[in-house]
């Protein structure tokens, strides 16, 4: 009787320890939310296009372009010719393109995203996918139905 009870407690302890280890090995990326470095993928070529650093400031998320993957023949530090106002003519590297996203359940909403290729700003919402390895980024005008979705991949380097 005592041996059976001891075996039961030992089994329960082992089960709990195993569960704790499994949780400990869960991706830290999901725990951090969308903050960190993300590789954007070109819609047409399916090749990496840029690295965006998403950071939190005063409870809101922002994203800044850290790096561009460009052909060696192209300008390696282009400026935003199509942007308006203070951003016109500014270097794209270092530019904040995601602004003011607030946590709303499993996604971050209420912010905006700038497309330096056309200089336009869109409403934006983002959500983690695949255990925090991917980021679904939706830019839209008016309603979320009228927009475009990209999937960014968490940067490894």
Placement of each model-derived feature along the sequence:
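N-terminal secretory signal peptides that target proteins for export/translocation
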Residues: 1-3
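Bacterial N-terminal signal peptides
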Residues: 8-17
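N-terminal helix-cap/turn-to-beta initiation motif at the start of protein domains
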Residues: 22-36
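Edge beta-strand at a domain terminus
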Residues: 24, 132-134, 140-157
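Central antiparallel beta-sheet cores of small beta-barrel/beta-sandwich binding domains
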Residues: 25, 40-124
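Short polar/acidic secondary-structure junctions
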Residues: 30, 43-45, 116, 127-129, ...
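Short aromatic-glycine motifs in intrinsically disordered, low-complexity regions
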Residues: 83-89, 136-143
């Amino acid at each position: 009787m005592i041996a059976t009870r001891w075996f039961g407690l030992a089994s329960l302890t082992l089960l709990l320890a195993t569960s704790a280890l499994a949780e400990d090995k869960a991706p830290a990326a999901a725990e951090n939310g969308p903050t960190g470095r993300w590789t954007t993928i070109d819609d047409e070529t399916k090749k990496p296009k840029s690295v965006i650093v998403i950071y939190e400031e005063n409870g809101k998320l922002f994203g800044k372009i850290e790096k561009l993957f460009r052909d060696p023949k192209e300008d390696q530090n282009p400026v935003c010719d199509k942007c308006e106002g203070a951003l016109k003519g500014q270097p794209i590297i270092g530019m904040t393109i995601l602004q003011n996203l607030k946590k709303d359940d499993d996604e971050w909403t209420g912010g905006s995203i700038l497309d330096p290729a056309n200089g336009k700003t869109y409403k934006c919402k983002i959500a983690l996918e695949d255990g925090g390895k991917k980021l679904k980024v939706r830019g839209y005008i008016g309603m979320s139905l009228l927009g475009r979705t990209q999937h960014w991949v968490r940067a490894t380097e």
